Amino acid sequence: LHKEIQLLELKQNIRTKTREDLDEQQREYFLQQQIKNIKEELGRGEGSPERKELELKAAKKNWSEDIAKTFRKELDKLDMFNPQSPEYSIQFNYLQTMIALPWGEYTKDNLDLKRAQRILNHDHYGMEKVKERILEYMAVLKLRGDLKSPIICLYGPPGVGKTSLGKSIAAAMKRKYVRMSLGGLHDESEIRGHRRTYVGAMPGRIIKNIQKAGSSNPVFILDEIDKVTQNTINGDPSSALLEVLDPEQNSAFHDNYLDVDYDLSKVLFIATANDLNTIPRPLLDRMELIEVSGYITEEKIEIAKRHLIPREIENCGLDKNEEKPTFTKAAIERIIEQYTRESGVRQLEKQVNKALRKIAYKKALDSDVNEKITPNEIEGLLGKAPFYRDIYQGNSYAGVVTGLAWTSVGGEILFIETSLSKGKTGKLTLTGNLGDVMKESAVIALEYVKAHIDT
């Protein structure tokens, strides 16, 4: 009897539990149907235009299973918000950003080395080291088929064409080109992005520029990397760049806004700098340094003839006439020597533009204009020369010697004069802003004279 009672109780418990489970399932189904109907009434159901559009675009994306899973999860979250709420807008913008990024999309490289060399030589005069390095990279890429991009840093004085070289490299390889200026960057979030919990959150500038390029392997110029502010109240941007510029890490770059990893390993990063001393050592170690030195006068003349003068003639509207203005070699040399003081050609370009503007003004007034610009016309076009170089014309004066000086804009000569005065101490007085080496040279010269005065 006791066993029979236990069996009946067990059957009753099973029957009760089964009924409860069925009731719970029916309740969940009923609630799900209610939620679905309410969403459809509000225009936010699975059939809403916004969701359909996002799902359609997502189906075409070439992304990994992890990213697809994250996208679906975030897409489901969208249904939880009211379309009029700020949260809905934030979530929708995030999903649009994910859709807009070129996940796994690469432009096909043109690895014709002769064509690339021709483009680089046409666009830029000199810069043999840089051109050689880019062509080597293309050659290895052609042989291997797959290669992590090098991280190159071009350093040198302003105006030598470091930034513009990036466009030529992109054209030579048929890649997209993007440029990001780092001058004055003081917030780490500019690199890594803001977390979505913040109002007005957005991805970092690295991800935004990749989105702008529409390709995951563009030529990416990081301009003025030596001007990045370090150790600020908003973090250290130079430390944030370590992940971007490390070939071992940038295959999984983490942006705070996206909150998923993005592959930057195929991006050809080219940084530019004027002074390496202001770049942190860990950042320098991750980059391949290539010096772009200043130009000598002969090189500047060639650059002016090939690039600057034709471009400025077009900018000033003087290319529409049959007779275009021409500069003689001596005229260009005079502009370089007496109107500019630089390693690059930026000031030279400005002076050429100024001269051509004067010619355009005279033409507009129907005045007579000499189309051939010689050294004699330069002062009339550019005004009085602000710089004059010392010229060695022989030296027969006792107590005057010629010295050689090195400056950032090239070599100089200088005249060092001495004079004797009566006295018992034999004191040496130096004038001018001299460095320690110059002072030591003067002391050695005096001691030499003392040692050999009686011989």
Regions found by a protein language model. Give the residues of each.
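Conserved P-loop NTPase/AAA+ ATPase motor core
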Residues: 351-455
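AAA+/SF3 P-loop NTPase mechanochemical coupling elements
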Residues: 213-218, 253-272, 326
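Conserved C-terminal "switch" segment of AAA+ ATPases
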Residues: 61-69, 104-106, 214, 275-353, ...
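AAA+/P-loop NTPase substrate/partner-engagement loops
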Residues: 172-202, 209, 229, 299
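Walker A/P-loop
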Residues: 148-182, 211, 242, 246
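Extended, charged alpha-helical coiled-coil/arm scaffolds that mediate oligomerization and mechanical coupling
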Residues: 1-144
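Conserved catalytic/switch belt of AAA+ P-loop NTPases
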Residues: 222-262, 266
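Pre-Walker A (Motif I) flank of P-loop NTPase domains
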Residues: 146-152, 216-218, 267, 426
